[in-house]
């Protein structure tokens, strides 16, 4: 399950030599299939600072009691290439004091999506370091 897989970072972008142009290419996301020129490697850049804050949308309303709890994310496939906006949402129904990947800190400073009593409000999360620190295998 997603809850048992620790998050070690968030993809910030990739760098590769494009097959068609043979020139260095940067992309903010990885979209399969990307085959670099001459079967070279793709270099991934990952934000792995455990206290990095991220803004994410919720899939349901949040209560104040849910702040500082941990949550898993639903990875949806409806994101867009043109804006880079993800459709991943924080699974509010799946919460635990310490076992899931993301810890909800507070509502985000987003005036248009700040109502925590509504689904898809913007909240601030950080990685839950409990999974990394207590991982035994």
What role is predicted for each listed range?
Residues 1-137:
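Surface-exposed, low-hydrophobicity beta-strand/loop segments enriched in small/polar/acidic residues
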